């Protein structure tokens, strides 16, 4: 299925549409929200429309995808996003407007999308976070994801070196982790970052 609507206690997870463009722009233009993401903040509504067409509208034409707007039930206004890429990594990603941080909104959305992925027989999901983005790691742990390893990557288009932590959850009851998820990486074993083992 392609992004079937999901309901949680507080949220509706649904497809983005063109009526969301102003809220979409608010999400993807905020420097803090997009600090740890692989794109630059959007500059105007025209960029938002192009970004929406490229990353959402086009994939809604596919047979199976998970590309959600996170909305409150009370007003159905989009306040964030949550996606699963269906490449080899099955990478889970999310973002939320900063005024809604620290309310466990993303955790609620993650729980729902994991349940949907399991229902549709995805065997596993992975997720990564910049080592500096501690709160994203907390979301992954709370969702039952297990830390696998850390790696360093030269990140484009921002042209910076980033240390990532990779997590995985197996949805098929099997143990172990996916060793090759199709990225060029240097595994970092028993290294430290600011005194902490990564």
Give the residues covered by each predicted segment:
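Polar/charged alpha-helical tracts
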Residues: 16, 46, 58-59, 158
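Acyl-donor (CoA/ACP) binding surface of acyl/acetyltransferases
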Residues: 1-35, 69-198
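Juxtamembrane helix-loop transition sites at the ends of transmembrane segments
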Residues: 47, 53-56, 120, 163-165
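A short helix-loop-beta-strand connector motif used in the catalytic cores of GNAT acetyltransferases and
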Residues: 55-69
């Amino acid at each position: 299925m392609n992004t079937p609507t999901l309901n949680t206690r507080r949220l509706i997870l649904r497809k983005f549409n063109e009526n969301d463009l102003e809220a979409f722009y608010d999400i993807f233009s905020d420097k803090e929200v997009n600090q740890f993401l692989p794109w630059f903040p959007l500059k105007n509504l025209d960029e938002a429309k192009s970004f929406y067409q490229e990353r959402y509208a086009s994939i809604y034409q596919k047979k199976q995808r998970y590309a959600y707007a996170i909305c409150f039930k009370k007003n159905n206004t989009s306040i964030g996003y949550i996606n699963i890429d269906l490449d080899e990594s099955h990478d889970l990603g999310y973002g939320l407007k900063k005024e809604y941080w620290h309310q466990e909104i993303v955790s609620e959305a993650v729980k729902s999308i994991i349940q949907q992925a399991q229902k549709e027989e995805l065997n596993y999901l992975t997720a990564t976070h910049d080592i500096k983005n501690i709160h994203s790691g907390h979301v992954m742990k709370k969702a039952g994801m297990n830390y696998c390893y850390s790696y360093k990557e030269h990140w484009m288009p921002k042209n910076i070196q980033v240390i990532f932590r990779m997590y995985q959850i197996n949805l098929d009851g099997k143990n172990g982790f996916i060793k090759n998820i199709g990225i060029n990486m240097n595994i970092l074993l028993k290294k430290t970052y600011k005194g902490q083992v990564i």
